[in-house]
Amino acid sequence: WFYCAYDIGSGAFTTWVYGKSKEGIISDFYRQMVRNYAEWGMCLPAEIECESSLNSTFRETLLSEGAMFRYVRMEANKARGKYIERVWEMQRYGKEKEREGWLARPNSLRESNQKSDEDIPIIPYEEIANNCLEDIVNWNNSAHPNQEKYPGKTRWEVFLENQHPDLKSINWNMILPYIGYKTETSCKAGTIKLQRKEFFLGMNGKI
């Protein structure tokens, strides 16, 4: 399973996580998104479009409007309802289809994409994951489709160079309680020990 975030304006993938099952993948996805944007020195996007099956558990918390994102569009589970599904179609029937072990869908509308009678080899999990990661990197480093507007720029360059100046800073207070990791510690004389470091609790300039 791969779960990814895609920036519509630049056409770049900005977050990706994967695993052998869906369990826990949505929390890992949002954690990784926050890590990425914080590391890049960027604000989180103003808006997110997501499907409801995995995201509904955060509907009243992390994904309530104004918490992690200013605007949230949670779409019912229909393939044509989300923009990213068109991107997945390009990925699936583009580079992925050329790889050994590609699995066709038996009910595909196009005959060329339907399952054949040939035996499909079993590909190791690590190889599949690495191929998908390579495809994401190559996609991001490919030319932006609107070269008239962004001449000579890749999707990734357009993403980095065109962040909106009015985006709000990461709302840590609304994010950490729901996807942050918790570590128990003790407090003695206004001092907390955490990860082999000491932190002091203060108020009005006093510990």
Identify the role of each PLM range.
Residues 129-207:
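C-terminal, beta-rich DNA-binding module of retroviral/retroelements integrases
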Residues 1-2, 6-127:
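RNase H-like DDE/DDD metal-dependent nuclease/strand-transfer catalytic core used by mobile genetic elements
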